[in-house]
Structure formats: C-alpha cells, structure tokens
C-alpha cells in the first residue's frame, strides 16, 4: 500500500511539473505592432509600438528603424507602457517621409529570454 501511495505521489509530481514548466520556457513573441507589418499608412507614425506575449525589459530591448535609402532613422530611448509591461514604445525623433521602412526589433523578456525579428511598413 505504501508503495502504491508513493508511486501515485511521484506520478502527480511529474504531471504537475510538466504542466507548469512550459510557461517558464516561453519567449516574448510579437503579437501586434503599429504600424502593422506590410501596412501602408498615410499619416507618419510618431512612434513604433510593439506588443509582446509577455513582459519585456526596457533596458535590453529596442528597435532599429531603417529608411527607404537604407539610412538609420533616429529614435529616442525605448520605453514600456506604464500600464502594460508587454508593450514597448519606440518614439521617432523626426517625422518619417514617404517610403518603405524596416523595423528590426529585439527584446529580452522579464524571464530573461532574448527574441528578435523584423518587419516592414510604408508611409504614403
């Protein structure tokens, strides 16, 4: 009987661990961005807004914006939305002119995982 109870506790511990562990291994994935990927906007954005699946660390996160002539677009320091630690805001120093822009973003999630990606959008 003691052996059966021990086996049951062991099986329950393994099941519980397998249900909890995947969330620890998660990475911050980009869930939404503004301007959206492949969007053609008529009004130039004042900032790039990136939303992730989990909270991000602003000190290790940011974005590089490249313009139509492959030039670097000046940005201000990235900041996190005060009400939403999953949202990173990258203010633009100057207004964007018409053309296609590439956003190369990188984040470190609150659990320490690094993620990066890129997308493009156009200003008409």
UniProtKB/Swiss-Prot annotation:
SUPFAM superfamilies documented for this protein: E set domains
GO cellular component: outer membrane-bounded periplasmic space
Single GO term (MF): copper ion binding
Gene3D superfamilies associated with the record: 2.60.40.1220
Protein's cellular compartments: Periplasm
Keyword Metal-binding carried by entry: yes
One GO term (biological process): copper ion homeostasis
Signal peptide: 1-26
InterPro entries per UniProt: CopC-like, CopC/D, CopC_dom, Cu-Rt/internalin_Ig-like, Ig_E-set
Pfam families, per the entry: CopC (PF04234)
Binding site for Cu cation: 27, 113
Keyword field: Copper, Metal-binding, Periplasm, Signal
Assigned protein family: Belongs to the CopC family.
Protein name: Protein YobA
Source organism of this protein record: Escherichia coli (strain K12)
Encoding gene per record: yobA
């Amino acid at each position: 009987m003691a052996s059966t109870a021990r086996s049951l506790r062991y099986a329950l511990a393994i099941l519980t661990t397998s249900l909890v562990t995947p969330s620890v291994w998660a990475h911050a994935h980009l869930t939404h961005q503004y301007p959206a990927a492949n969007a053609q906007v008529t009004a130039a954005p004042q900032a790039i807004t990136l939303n992730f699946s989990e909270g991000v660390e602003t000190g290790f996160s940011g974005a590089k914006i490249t313009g139509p002539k492959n030039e670097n677009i000046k940005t201000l320091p990235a900041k996190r939305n005060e009400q939403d630690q999953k949202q990173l805001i990258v203010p633009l120093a100057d207004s964007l002119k018409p053309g296609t822009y590439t956003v190369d973003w990188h984040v470190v999630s609150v659990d320490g995982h690094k993620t990066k990606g890129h997308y493009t959008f156009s200003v008409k």
